Amino acid sequence: MEKTFNLTRREDGIAILTMDVPGETMNTLKAEFGPEISEILSEIKRDSSIRGLVLISGKKDSFVAGADISMLDACQTAGDAKALSQQGHVVFNELEALNIPVVAAIHGACLGGGLELALACHQRVCSDDGKTMLGVPEVQLGLLPGGGGTQRLPRLVGITTALDMMLTGKQIRPKQALKMGLVNDVVPQTILLQTAVEMALAGKRTAKPVKKSLVNQLLEGTGFGRNIIFDQAAKQVAKKTQGNYPAPAKIIDCVRQGMAKGMQKGLEVEASHFAELVVSKESEALRSIFFATTEMKKETGAEGATPRKVKKAVILGGGLMGGGIASVTTTKAKIPARVKDINEKGLSNALSYAYKLLDKGVKRRHMTPAVRDNLMALMTTTTEYKGVKDADIVVEAVFEDLALKHQMVKDIERECGEHTIFASNTSSLPIGQIAQAASRPENVIGLHYFSPVEKMPLVEVIAHAKTSPETIATTVAFARKQGKTPIVVQDGAGFYVNRILALYMNEAAQLLLEGQSIEHLDKALVKFGFPVGPITLLDEVGIDVGAKIAPILEKELGERFKAPAAFDKLLSDDRKGRKNGKGFYQYAAGNKAPSKKKAVDESVYGVLGIKPGIDKEMSAVAERCVVQMLNEAVRCLDDGIIASPRDGDIGAIFGIGFPPFLGGPFHYIDTLGADNLVKILERYQAQYGDRFEPCPRLKEMAAEKTRFF
């Protein structure tokens, strides 16, 4: 059996411990490595000729990407999980206790357990490469750093900085890591090992303490000051998580107890809290999302199909969506993009949009001006069909007008090659209808981005009846290169995300018309776990956009999609939402941004002809909206719009911010129990009508007591 850790000795007395997990592209820590590492550490202790130790990775671009998450699924009880954490503590404590200097030479991802391993070393040096990132992202899986990270990190970089890293899971770039004292030096990769060896030869076992501001010294250096930090952090966490995520509060407690009662006590608390989180339903749900997205990355979207390489893209339309799509094509995918618009204003908008995003990166020192300019050079513009013939994919982002899209299809088939893919960014028009104008319908596909394009992770890849497998696979690969999470859905009104969102939004509108206040509605759904409430979302998306999509969904899918008639009054009053500074909420004059203290525009109640009454329980408000979404998600599965419950969960979480701690609509139905969900729907059906009728599959599952997972 191949070893993961190999120890070599240099003539100068420095030993090099290389980690290289056999058969894997990245290093991850596994429970079975414990005895192997302990044996090597014992060997080092016995060998008096070893003057220092350097830890380095044998992988090309990865130090240690973290612990192997699948280990956690093997834990049957909290006791098993606690033993796992304690095993890590023993090994890392042993490494830290070596009486020779130990230096971590870091290149590539150094995350989670990988950073905890580096923290147990006496010093750290990392490469200045863009691939090098350091962080503890465990909170994103509903966990906490369980290998001593909650104790060593605050002692190294300070409590405030450590809490910020652990509570957000943010990844730190090399220069930032040096500034905060997380690493002792940053050097080019070519001299990384040499520098680490020199540091080990210098014989220092402790690093210089990081300089702290006077305020930080006062806060972190006294029990009273530390309590202020912890209390403030706890308040912020409670506000942000709405009590839905247990990990952040436990992270704060680990640091608090460790700083008050010492490292040993802190490690004990860390192991206990880690164990509780591993077996929590929230972490199980978040880990299921992680595994689902990892699994999806290996799929082409069309079984047996090989994607063609996309060397050039054309984007039709220089508006908000077109500019965003062009931007992620050049900056993320590094693919040349040519933007075509009928007027120069649209083109300058697209260029300005991309430049502003890149310039933010320069201002934050994430890139140099030269890198920004090189990426901008990948974007070119035209008002005519010039320089488009060699495009591999054309993404259409023009108005939602079928005749216009038909014209675009004909233009592209005339101007481009026979294999050029025509991908429409429509949010509502069926792709099959757009493809009716094509002589090569196999090349036509939907590619539905969400706004703002650079922030929203999901894209829906929509195949109509004649879309070829190669077109699907190529489009999926293209979306992944843009940094997106693509789900393949079948053609149909609203596709998947907008279809399940529409009923949720409609129900919120019904509640509003029944007298629930706007603030109460939004607060109820934020408390449930959505990033924003439904009324805020309607203002953001645009009331006019909602009004345009609703009749299409009603025509194709039936009466349950009928939007409340009262909403026509909003458009008559020229209320489109944030885009024109007039919607449900008040907006600061001129910039269309919400007022600092977000306030409802009370005049909207008069426009709708309603008067807010007594607010219902938040849980009841949220339930009515959410069960509509759950019921429709199952209908989408039955209709073949989505291929699996897994895809439905990913689409809802990454497309509309369905609460990740619930694992997605299908995971949540399993948690509730199909029988319980059917009872809730039937109760509402009796009270409010057939829009709540449970779909056939849910009724079957309720009767047979079956689950999706």
Curated annotation (Swiss-Prot):
Tell me any Pfam family this protein matches: 3HCDH
- GO CC, alphabetical: cytoplasm
SUPFAM superfamilies membership: 6-phosphogluconate dehydrogenase C-terminal domain-like (SSF48179), ClpP/crotonase (SSF52096), NAD(P)-binding Rossmann-fold domains (SSF51735)
- Catalytic activity as recorded in UniProt: a (3S)-3-hydroxyacyl-CoA = a (2E)-enoyl-CoA + H2O; a 4-saturated-(3S)-3-hydroxyacyl-CoA = a (3E)-enoyl-CoA + H2O; a (3S)-3-hydroxyacyl-CoA + NAD(+) = a 3-oxoacyl-CoA + NADH + H(+); (3S)-3-hydroxybutanoyl-CoA = (3R)-3-hydroxybutanoyl-CoA
| GO terms assigned for molecular function | 3-hydroxybutyryl-CoA epimerase activity; enoyl-CoA hydratase activity; long-chain-3-hydroxyacyl-CoA dehydrogenase activity; NAD+ binding
Domain of life, per UniProt, equals Bacteria
According to its UniProt entry, the protein's GO biological process terms are: fatty acid beta-oxidation
**CDD domains in the cross-refs:** crotonase-like
Q: In which pathway does it act?
A: Lipid metabolism; fatty acid beta-oxidation
Residue span of region Enoyl-CoA hydratase: 1-188
Using the UniProt record, give the first listed, main subcellular location: cytoplasm
- Complex formation: Heterotetramer of two alpha chains (FadJ) and two beta chains (FadI).
Q: Which family does it belong to?
A: In the N-terminal section; belongs to the enoyl-CoA hydratase/isomerase family.
What is the role of the protein in this entry?
Catalyzes the formation of a hydroxyacyl-CoA by addition of water on enoyl-CoA. Also exhibits 3-hydroxyacyl-CoA epimerase and 3-hydroxyacyl-CoA dehydrogenase activities.
**Which protein, by its recorded name, is this?**
Fatty acid oxidation complex subunit alpha
Tell me the gene name: fadJ
